[in-house]
Amino acid sequence: MPLQPSVQRWTWVALATALWFAPALSAQAGNFSAHLTAAPASYQGICPGTIKFSGEIRATQPGKVQFQYIRSDGAPSPVQTLLFGSAGSKPLSTTWTLGSPSLPRYTGWIAIQFVHPQTDRSKPANFNILCTIRPR
């Protein structure tokens, strides 16, 4: 059954609009990427222990990006802003100190959550902590 002329016309208008804006939307969605690594990825020792996370945000063109760290325990972090005058990368770092007699073992992660202009996230930087008893 053929479509009515008015339906065909609106279908073509919608398709043309989508094709017109698709390059701008895809370029904006992929301007930034991030990665983090945990050091040490596996901690065993006297607690509390500190895990250091380092990495970078990479831009494919000039622009502003807003992001925050997200953690496996759900603790919030403030939104941060980086300005890129040109394509390139900027270093990132944060720490997480944890482990106690009430939490002697923990497996977790931290990732970068982009807030603006895109909303994707990095792969998580995984780690684990195993507290040992302090020698007397």
Features from the language model and the residues they span:
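Extended, solvent-exposed regions of the mature portions of secreted/cell-surface glycoproteins
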Residues: 27-136
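Bacterial N-terminal signal peptides that target proteins for export
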Residues: 2-14
